[in-house]
């Protein structure tokens, strides 16, 4: 067998493997965000070219604004189209990796908690960081468009996680990351309440309906 024929065989077998695994996964759920651009304090906050080059998202929404009561918001929404490394790229953006690089110190983290919004159950993990004596509460959700049994939020971007995702066919599916940072909340509980209210305003759901 020639080298070219061997490469074609390997590539074909790989593609068949991905398709066979994906066909067993649940039907997709689709959602996006719509931020309050009519807020007078709304400001776009583009990712740096270095960050975009590393993460390579297909869609980026990043902005900040201030609400009545002086709650300051920063939201980053990233989306990756289906592809062989979508899951790995999505896992590269987490608060544990990004916030310390901006001078923030991690003070506490909380287990995954589901927040219901527009008919979608979004799994968020909460973090409390501090910089210059001021706390900031960060909530992180990583969403697989065709999720497996386990919740993916907070998975580490290690080779083991990559291989696990490949084995179940999950890594080829579309991926989304939603990170919400809140400054001005008295504590984690107050920040969670503010997050729940804000999600109802900014989440847009377009979940696929089963075909009959």
Regions found by a protein language model. Name each.
Residues 1-15:
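Hydrophobic membrane-insertion alpha-helices, especially the h-region
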Residues 41-169:
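Short, solvent-exposed recognition patches
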Residues 35-37, 68, 171-173:
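A generic structural signal for short, non-catalytic loop/turn and secondary-structure boundary residues
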Residues 174-212:
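Surface-exposed amphipathic alpha-helical segments
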Residues 34-47, 183-188:
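Generic structural signal for short, solvent-exposed loop/turn connectors between secondary structure elements
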Residues 17-38:
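Alpha-helical transmembrane signal-anchor/signal-peptide segments
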């Amino acid at each position: 067998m020639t080298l070219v024929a061997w490469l074609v065989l390997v590539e074909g077998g790989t593609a068949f493997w991905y398709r066979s695994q994906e066909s067993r996964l649940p039907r997709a759920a689709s959602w996006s965000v719509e931020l309050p651009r009519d807020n007078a304090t709304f400001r776009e906050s583009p990712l740096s070219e270095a960050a975009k080059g590393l993460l390579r998202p297909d869609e980026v929404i990043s902005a900040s604004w201030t609400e009545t009561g002086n709650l300051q918001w920063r939201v980053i929404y990233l989306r990756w189209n289906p592809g062989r490394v979508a899951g790995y790229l999505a896992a590269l953006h987490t608060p544990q990796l990004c916030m310390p690089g901006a001078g923030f110190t991690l003070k506490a983290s909380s287990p995954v908690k589901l927040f219901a919004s527009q008919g979608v159950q979004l799994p968020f993990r909460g973090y409390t960081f501090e910089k210059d004596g001021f706390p900031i509460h960060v909530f992180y959700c990583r969403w697989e468009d065709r999720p497996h049994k386990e919740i993916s939020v907070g998975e580490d971007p290690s080779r083991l996680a990559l291989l696990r995702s490949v084995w179940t066919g999950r890594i080829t599916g579309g991926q989304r990351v939603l990170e919400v940072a809140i400054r001005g909340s008295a504590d984690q509980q107050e920040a969670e309440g503010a997050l729940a209210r804000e999600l109802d305003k900014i989440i847009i759901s377009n979940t696929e309906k089963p075909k009959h």
